[in-house]
UniProtKB/Swiss-Prot annotation:
UniProt keyword Cytoplasm present: yes
Catalytic activity reported: Hydrolysis of proteins to small peptides in the presence of ATP and magnesium. alpha-casein is the usual test substrate. In the absence of ATP, only oligopeptides shorter than five residues are hydrolyzed (such as succinyl-Leu-Tyr-|-NHMec, and Leu-Tyr-Leu-|-Tyr-Trp, in which cleavage of the -Tyr-|-Leu- and -Tyr-|-Trp bonds also occurs)
Cellular localisation: Cytoplasm
Subunit structure, interactors included: Fourteen ClpP subunits assemble into 2 heptameric rings which stack back to back to give a disk-like structure with a central cavity, resembling the structure of eukaryotic proteasomes.
This protein's name: ATP-dependent Clp protease proteolytic subunit 2
Name of the encoding gene: clpP2
One annotated Gene Ontology cellular component of this protein: endopeptidase Clp complex
Its EC number(s): 3.4.21.92
Disulfide bonds: none
Catalytic center residues: 103 (nucleophile), 128
Origin species: Synechococcus sp. (strain CC9902)
Homology family: Belongs to the peptidase S14 family.
Length: 207
C-alpha cells in the first residue's frame, strides 16, 4: 500500500499486447522505484514503507530507491523502523522533501544516502525533540520520562552523525521547533542539495 494522503487516486492506463491495464498512480510509480511518505508516521505507515523497500531491494539491489517525504512526523519507534530499514537495504535511498518534512519526517529525510538527500525549492524542514507525556503514578511517569530521554539522545546522536553538527548544537537547536529553508538545510547538513527548476539536480527515474 503506497503511503499518501487520503482521497481518490488517479489511475494510469497502460496499453500492451495483452490489452489495457489500469494502475493507481502510486502503484505505477512504485514500479519506477518511487515511494511516497505523504502522511504522519505510525506503525501501519512503517509496515508499508518497510515492505516496499524490501520488495524493491529484492527486485534489484543495485538501483536506487527514491522516497518522497511530505510528513509532519509521528511515532518515534515507527520512524526508527523505517530508518533502520533505509540503512539496511542494499540500494542507495534517495530522499526528496516536497512540502514539509517535520519532526520524524525531517529525521527520515536526513537518513537518506549521503549525497542523495534533496529538497524542492519551496519545501520546509523542521527538527525538534520527541514529544511525550505521561499520566499515572509517579513511578510510571518516571519510566516514561526515562524512555523519552533515551529516544531524544538516540535521535540527537543520529542527527549529529548525518549532519556533521556537534551533538551539543543538535541538542540546543532541537529544544524547540527549528525551521529551515532548503538552502539552510543544506548548510546545516540535513540535505545535500536543492532541486533546481530544470530538475537537473537529482529527481531521476530509472528507465
Amino acid at each position: 500500500m503506497p503511503i499518501s494522503a487520503p482521497g481518490p487516486l488517479p489511475t494510469v492506463v497502460e496499453q500492451s499486447g495483452r490489452g489495457d491495464r489500469a494502475f493507481d498512480i502510486y502503484s505505477r510509480l512504485l514500479r519506477e522505484r518511487i515511494i511516497f511518505l505523504g502522511t504522519g508516521v505510525d506503525d501501519a505507515v512503517a509496515d508499508a514503507l518497510v515492505a516496499q523497500m524490501l520488495f524493491l531491494e529484492a527486485e534489484d539491489p543495485e538501483k536506487d530507491i527514491q522516497i518522497y517525504v511530505n510528513s509532519p512526523g509521528g511515532s518515534v519507534t515507527a520512524g526508527l523502523a523505517i530508518y533502520d530499514t533505509m540503512q539496511q537495504v542494499a540500494p542507495d535511498v534517495v530522499t526528496i522533501c516536497y512540502g514539509l518534512a517535520a519532526s520524524m519526517g525531517a529525521f527520515l529525510l536526513s537518513g537518506g544516502t549521503k549525497g542523495k538527500r534533496l529538497a524542492l525549492p519551496n519545501a520546509r524542514i523542521m527538527i525538534h525533540q520527541p514529544l511525550g507525556g505521561a499520566q499515572g503514578q509517579a513511578v510510571d511517569i518516571e519510566i516514561q520520562a526515562k524512555e523519552i530521554l533515551f529516544l531524544k539522545e538516540t535521535l540527537n546522536g543520529l542527527l549529529a552523525e548525518h549532519t556533521g553538527q556537534p551533538l551539543d548544537k543538535i541538542s540546543e537547536d532541537t529544544d524547540r521547533d527549528y525551521f529551515l529553508s532548503p538552502a539552510e538545510a543544506v548548510e546545516y547538513g540535513l540535505i545535500d542539495r536543492v532541486v533546481d527548476s530544470s530538475g537537473d539536480e537529482g529527481i531521476v527515474t530509472d528507465g
